[in-house]
Amino acid sequence: MKLLVIVLSSLLLTSCAGGGLSNSSENSYVSGSGAAVYIKQSDRRDAPKFSGETLTTGDLTLNSNQVTVINVWASWCAPCRAEAPLLQEFSIQYPQVQFAGVLTRDNISSAKAFYENFKLTYPTFIDDSILVGFKGSLIPNAIPTTLIIDKQGKVAVRISGEATVATLKKMLEKVTADA
């Protein structure tokens, strides 16, 4: 009986933390808590090279010698919709930083509607197999997830869940100040 209570409590807490499981094709994804993890320079891992087809601009390769914000999103994700205006605003406020999205578990027509609705101007990669290169840096199944890659091409920050103005600003300033 005690075990049953523990299991049910765990399931309840998991489903309440940041949105729980969503429906339809995205049924194995959960929203993160929004917690940001700053990784000290000596512990950072290489990020994969970003190259591939984008939602609107065709093939693209990102500059690996520039601070880069990568946002993993889907049009059906409520926290993704909530943070999209913030990411767009920051992409304009920080012209020295590259911004890019990675679409996951979504269809192109819904993603394009999302992209147009939020007037996003930064590119979004449509092949989420690029995420395999982030093994160990991404929390499996957390959408949205935002990564900040430093100038050396290493993962410096992971935000699992909806990014806030304060968190994104603090983390961007920290990473851009890194030597």
Range-by-range predicted roles:
Residues 1-49, 179:
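N-terminal targeting signals for export/organelle localization
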Residues 36, 71, 132-135:
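N-terminal post-signal-peptidase region of extra-cytosolic proteins
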Residues 42-68:
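A short beta-strand-turn-helix
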Residues 58-81, 87:
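Short active-site neighborhood of thiol/selenol oxidoreductases, capturing the structured segment around
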Residues 65-67, 95-98, 122:
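Loop/turn elements at helix/coil->beta-strand transitions in domains of secreted/extracellular proteins
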Residues 81-118, 130-135:
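Structural microenvironment flanking redox-active thiols in thiol-disulfide oxidoreductases
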Residues 116-121, 127-177:
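Thiol/disulfide oxidoreductase modules built on the thioredoxin-like
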